[in-house]
Each structure stands twice: as C-alpha cells, then as structure tokens.
UniProtKB/Swiss-Prot annotation:
Monomer. Part of the FGAM synthase complex composed of 1 PurL, 1 PurQ and 2 PurS subunits. Part of the phosphoribosylformylglycinamidine synthase complex involved in the purines biosynthetic pathway. Catalyzes the ATP-dependent conversion of formylglycinamide ribonucleotide (FGAR) and glutamine to yield formylglycinamidine ribonucleotide (FGAM) and glutamate. The FGAM synthase complex is composed of three subunits. PurQ produces an ammonia molecule by converting glutamine to glutamate. PurL transfers the ammonia molecule to FGAR to form FGAM in an ATP-dependent manner. Mg(2+) 2 binds at residues 106, 251. It is an enzyme of class 6 (ligase). It comes from the Archaea. It holds the Pfam family AIRS. It comes from Metallosphaera sedula (strain ATCC 51363 / DSM 5348 / JCM 9185 / NBRC 15509 / TH2). This is Phosphoribosylformylglycinamidine synthase subunit PurL. ATP binds at residues 39, 80, 468, 505. GO terms for molecular function: ATP binding; magnesium ion binding; phosphoribosylformylglycinamidine synthase activity. Pathway: Purine metabolism; IMP biosynthesis via de novo pathway; 5-amino-1-(5-phospho-D-ribosyl)imidazole from N(2)-formyl-N(1)-(5-phospho-D-ribosyl)glycinamide: step 1/2.
Amino acid sequence: MILTLSKTEMEVVRRVLGREPKEAEWKLVDALWSEHCSYKSSKVFLRSLPSTGPNVIMSVEDWQDAGAVDVGDGLALVLKVESHNHPSAIDPFNGAATGVGGILRDIISKGAKPIALLDMIRVGKLDDKGKWLLKNIISGIGFYGNSVGVPVVGGELSFDETYNDNPLVDVACAGIVSKDSIVPSVVREPGLRLVLAGFTGLDGLGGASFASRKLSGMDEIGAVQIADPFAGKIIIDVTLEIAKEVEAIKDLGGGGLAVAVTEMANGLGAVVNLERVPLRFEYLSPEDIIISETQERMLFAVKPEKVESVCAKFREYNYPCEDIGEITAEPKVRFLYNGEPVAELPSDLLLSPPLNVWPAERKPRKREPEREVALGEALRAVLTHPDLVSKEWAYSQFDYEVGTSTVVKPGQGDSAVVELPNGKYLALKGDANQDLCAEDAYECGKAIVAEAYRNLATVGARGIALVDHLQFGDPRKPHVYQDFIDAVRGISEASKFFSIPVVGGKVSFHNEDKNGNPIKPTPLVVMAGLVEGKLARNRVEEGDLVLIGETRNELAGTLFSRIFGGGGEVAKTRLMEDLIASNLVIKGINEGKITWNKDVSKGGLAGALLPILAKGFSVRISSSQVIGTSNLLGKMFSESGGRFLVLTSDPQWFMYQAGRMGIQALAIGKVTKDGSKLVLDYETFPMDSIVENYYSFLEGSL
C-alpha cells in the first residue's frame, strides 16, 4: 500500500508519539489524514461557506455524514453529494455502483429514507475507452439504484476531453425523516458499544489514500470496492428499522473502520476487538481489517442493553452483526487482536492533521479575438454536440418511477420533482460548468449556484439548501489551488446572496490525466427547493416566445468557444438579475401564464430552443428583439446568466411585469406546428437532421 503522508506529516506523528509508529498505525494515520477524509488542503477555505439558516437542522458539522433542513410538517430533508471518480476510472461498473451504495448509506445514517438519486456524469471523447467507461458507469448506477428501489430522478451527462483519463461520477441523494428522529453520526458519552453489521473483505484496501493521489494505473484495482446491492437493501431496511434504538450511526466509507470508529468517537476514545469483526475471508490480517473499505457495512453506537435486539434484526436476514468494542472516556483509539495491541493512537492526533495552505497563483488568461463562423455552421456544430442531445438512452436504464413519488421525470424539465409525504413538491438539480470554470473559477462558482437556482424556478420552486462537490487537480499546483480558492469564493458569495445554506459537500483533488495535466476545474452544486404555489408542467404548443433577461456578447467559456475556439468576454454573473428573473418565472407559473419554459445556459439561446425543435415544431426568431449585443453569434450562443425562454399566450404580461421589476423581457418570436425548422429573421435553417441526431446520437454512438 502506498502511503500519501508527506515527510513533514510523518515527522509530526513521530514527534507527538515520541516513537516510531507501527505499520498498522501508519495506515491508520494515512487514512485519517488523507485529503479524502481530512480536507486538510481545503478546510481553511470551506469555512467561508454559509452553513446556517432558520431551516437548517444539521449542516457542515464535523463528522456528520449528511446535512438536513426543515421542510415543514415535522419533516426534515436530508441531502448529500459524493463521487467515485478514481474507482470509476479503474473499474467503472463497481466504481459507479459503490458510489450509489455509499451515498445511500450516508442518508440512512441519519435515520432518513432515501427517496431520490441524481447522477452527474462527465466523460471524455467516445472512443473505445470512453464508450467502455460510459456504458459501465451507467450500468453500475442503474444496477444499484434499481436493485434497492430508489429512483434515479435526474442528473447531467457531459462530454469533454479533459475527462478522457479521469471521468467524474457524482451521485446525490435526498432522504426524508421526522426532524425529531434524526440520528447523529457522532457520540457524546462513553460506555456505548460499537456494533458492526456486514462482512469485511479485501476489496477497497487503501481506498481513501487511493482517492487522495493521482491515478498511476499500477495495482489500483484492489482499491476499488465491490458492489452488492442486495446486501445493501438489507442494510437500508434494517438500519431504518432500528434507527430509534441506537445512539449514532456511521457508514463505513473511505478509510473503513479506521475512519468510522475515530470519527464516531468524536474526541472520546474507542477500543475495537478486531477478532470479533465478521470476515469474508479468514486470512485477513489485522492491519487489513482496519482499513478495508468493503461495502454494505454500518457501524452503530448502541447502549449495552440494546445490542442483542439490534443484531437480532440483522440476523433475521442471515446478515452478520457483532459487538466489536466500545466507546471509552480515555481519548485514545485502540485496535486489539486477541487482546494484543495492533494500533494505539491519541484521538486528537488522528482528528487534527496539519492543515495545508498551498501557494496559489492565478493563471494568465489569454483573451483571443472572437471567431467569425457562419451561422449555419455554428448552429449545426453546437446543436449536435453530445452535451445537448437527448439523454433518454441513459435515464431509460434507471427505474425513475419506483416509489411512485416522481412527478417531473428525467427529460421533462430543467429540474427533477418528487412529492414528499406532506404533499409538498421537492425540486432537485445538479449543475456544473467546466468551460466557464476554466476561464474564470470565481465567476463560475457564482454561476453554477445561480443556474441551479434558475433551474428550480422553471418548475416553480425556490431553493432552500445546497450541497457542493469541488473537483480539481493537484492542490500543490499554484494555478489549480487558485482556481479552487476562487470557486469556493464564488459559491459562497452566491449562496449568501440567495440565502441558501450549504449543508454539506465534498472535495476531490488529484483529478488528472495520465500526463499529470489537471482536469478543467469542475465544482458542482446540487440544490434542493420547494415548489411555491403551482408546479409547472412543461408542454410545447403553438404560442409566443418571450426571452427574459439581457443577452451580452459573452462567448468565452461557452460551448460555442469550446467547439470553435476564440473567446471574447467571459460571462459575468449578475446575481440580482438571476433573482429577479426567477421571481418573474415563478410568478408567471402561479398565474398560469407559462406553457413551457427553460433557463438559457448551455448552448445559449440556440441550445434553449432545441427541445422545442425536437418536438417537431418550427421556431421563428427576430434577432433584433434579442437585445444586449449586436453580434448575431453572441445573440444565439452567449451563455449570459439571468435569462429564461418562456412559451406563452400572453407575452404582454411578461413585458409589463418585467418592466415593473426592472429587468428586460421581449417577445422574440413564435412557435408553430410546421415541422422542425428555425427561421432567423429571413433565413430558414432546416432542423430535421439535427433533431434526428438529438434522439439517436447517444445510443448510436455506444
């Protein structure tokens, strides 16, 4: 196993202990101090994120496995996002499947029932390797989600050569629980017994350390965990059944027992008897038992008199469950094997790694002149790009209606919507923008929060909480670290502006290609919101198109610039425009003025028109009504924020309301049932082949 500890960190350990640590102790420290578990290179900046609010029940508190917010009627929404990037690059099926399993266990560790999954997938070009990665990632997610009966209700699928060697596989999960029944992940008192459910095997050895370094391609398959959704279903059902009988619950994720026990003890101590751990193979060494990341395991802190009843529930399913130790008052974590010490380290040492603040330097951005491209060529290239095609092939692999609570299904709108037990509608959306982040990570951080907020508004919802996942290259590289800092600053600023608390998140560094080049910065947010009033149900029909918001000539960091190069200006995020435009859309939904709507983002106005054209309708646009720039390419492909495209029978209402609110809204054209074509001013662009590509590209390419 490769240790990721630096020489300085190893000296700190030796100095604190006053001795040379044993091999097992080095592995223990390596797991707890890994970037994956400790956030040692990011924690200083993560503290700037707003994490409190009137509805927040549980937020970014140390060692809590998920955040929770009040959604009324005595219920709490539990929210979490995770990734399995490195494992998915090595074994995409199991890497993706175990990512789903892990996040489900994070949700049930709060005593919450999982009600919805989202998957945000980013892969490179669709060559043989890319096809293999994507097909197996999709299969892995579907295999686990479908088997345990949790619907995959939405997500993203993006293609960019920056992810050729290092795909990004993000999974988010929402759960629901009585707010008085939330279970903590940490304990407050000694004397509790540590109960472990599930077998421990050899898979996932050193997974936390593996996730905290660049991929080397050498002997890494053993660090990938193996998925068993049928065991996962037992874990989910029994954990929810016994949640009220236990004092704390923790998933055995990164770092295995080493991390779960130490974090659950939360500064107290623990004694673990490794010979009591149920093993899948008899020949596991004590050191491997400590750091194994075998899936489908949970750790419970239980009062002594409740141990037997807790384990009895698992044994009804012939599922292993054993009392393996206890929480102690002495602040020391001890792992024993048949009474002999294997590792014995102070809790403070394990929970207090030296924090890093690396040198940071903003990368010079070359402002290239804008490219001159024929409009027809630009339309074909942008509208046939894989990022904009129908993702039906992907979401058809998932059972998105299991549980019967899914209201807005994948492909039906900009946000997924599920019905909560109290009758309210919960909207969920994940957003990232690697192109904009590669140009300006600060503006990107603001923009992805604003886009998620707008996406929720398209179904009539207003955001109430978000979680983030910050995915970058090696933080020791100054340009990478500066992008990370800038992205956090942008996310923090936008979240504060919209009064949306960040209740959880994850940081994933060391995402690089085989040559050591970092991926484009890819921070991602997943926002949850509640529908205010009416729920929008999009339908395309004949009517007037209204563009809300101003279109600036901002083509740098867009899909257009990725395809054609060149640049121009980077889109500036104007949060007040996003807020006011979202308010107008929600008002329009509640007053019955909207038949179809979409936020304008990827692919610009042209990209927003594509779903209408794909339904067999014609669109006639007057470019003079798209105000803010005289550049026709800017009008069609700029990804300026604060904009919505609305289909309505009452365009005057929108123009009047927008004027009162201080923003722009103009009728820019009409939709007619006249075959798929785009008429821009006096030029007609047939769309039949583009529409055919829209529906056939993904399945045909695989």
